Amino acid sequence: DNSYKVSGGLHGVGVSVVNALSRKLELTIHRAGHIHQQEYKHGDPVYPLTVVGDTDTTGTTVRFWPSAETFSQTIFNVDILARRLRELSFLNAGVRIVLRDERIHAEHVFDYEGGLSEFVKYINQGKTHLNDIFHFTVQAENGIGVEVALQWNDTYQENVRCFTNNIPQKDGGTHLAGFRAALTRGLNSYMENENLLKKEKVAVSGDDAREGLTAIVSVKVPDPKFSSQTKEKLVSSEVKPAVEQAMNKSFSEYLLENPQAAKSIAGKIIDAARARDAARKAREMTRRKSALDIAGLPGKLADCQEKDPALSELYLVEGDSAGGSAKQGRNRKMQAILPLKGKILNVERARFDKMISSQEVGTLITALGCGIGREEYNPDKLRYHKIII
């Protein structure tokens, strides 16, 4: 009776759909000392459920063959299956899942005793971490189970993944809201108690707190409610206080018991707040220098005469010498030339403030004319519809 208390949905619907879309489906059930078997063809039973033997084990085997009448392609992508089965193994510590690809005689075994801790470790491999993984599991009084694992690394992106009853929510929901609220409150409380905010003269935001954070938030909810059939956002209101309360208590204790880790995390957050402020100032400066204002265009840009972006081309060339040759050989009517240094900043690995303060990147932003950042970026203002590197 307890098996489906925190299930992901109506399992019968899932197998019914698979059955209807398969030319053949075989069920083998080991239960109550007997082996039961049934076969279906395009969703219709070939024969009733039949006892075919005795057993001392339990479990169900489902085999299906996708219908070529329904699908134009029936090739399974093992990478997609492996990714999801690995995820399920992380979310259910100690559960061993074996994936065999009999087409090439390959076998993948997923077995993670550490659960979410190992999930965070897997995501953060190859990155420099700032703290040991923080991990807790709590069973709330209302039957909601909360499990969280997190770790900060030296990157600048937030990577928080949320799950309800093993189902991923790419749009988050009430569990994510509870987690974020508790995380920000716990860090602000720690930094205020240590007098870091006044000392460093910064105001930190939730975004600053989550820069470089990898976290997994997994909840087990008896009757979850989602915003849609695809379950991409959790809307159960009782989950937010459950996650927030559990996270508040456990995370505050972690910060007090691990002063060195807390200090490293706080240092990264303060750096993020400073960078955000510097980026805001740089954005304002870029906004004032409108790229559509000819006076604001980069000095090295040899612009074209054409004013219609759809007919204009921009050539990005390496260095002034190549720029000189390109300017001599271009069609002035529609071809613009912008010389740049050979090796500029790798913006994928750079923080926003460093990127925007780079002279070469700034020149590109101004020449292209569509701005930068979530609030400013507008591709409709692009000055050249063809850009040649």
From Swiss-Prot:
It comes from Acinetobacter johnsonii. The keyword Zinc does not apply. Few gyrases are as efficient as E.coli at forming negative supercoils. Not all organisms have 2 type II topoisomerases; in organisms with a single type II topoisomerase this enzyme also has to decatenate newly replicated chromosomes. It catalyses: ATP-dependent breakage, passage and rejoining of double-stranded DNA. One of its GO terms (biological process) is DNA topological change. Keywords: ATP-binding, Cytoplasm, DNA-binding, Isomerase, Nucleotide-binding, Topoisomerase. One of its GO terms (cellular component) is cytoplasm. The gene is gyrB. Its EC number is 5.6.2.2. Its main location: cytoplasm. It is found in: Cytoplasm. Heterotetramer, composed of two GyrA and two GyrB chains. In the heterotetramer, GyrA contains the active site tyrosine that forms a transient covalent intermediate with DNA, while GyrB binds cofactors and catalyzes ATP hydrolysis. One of its GO terms (molecular function) is DNA binding. Signal peptide: none annotated. This is DNA gyrase subunit B. It holds the Pfam family DNA_gyraseB. Residues 312-389 form the Toprim domain. A type II topoisomerase that negatively supercoils closed circular double-stranded (ds) DNA in an ATP-dependent manner to modulate DNA topology and maintain chromosomes in an underwound state. Negative supercoiling favors strand separation, and DNA replication, transcription, recombination and repair, all of which involve strand separation. Also able to catalyze the interconversion of other topological isomers of dsDNA rings, including catenanes and knotted rings. Type II topoisomerases break and join 2 DNA strands simultaneously in an ATP-dependent manner.
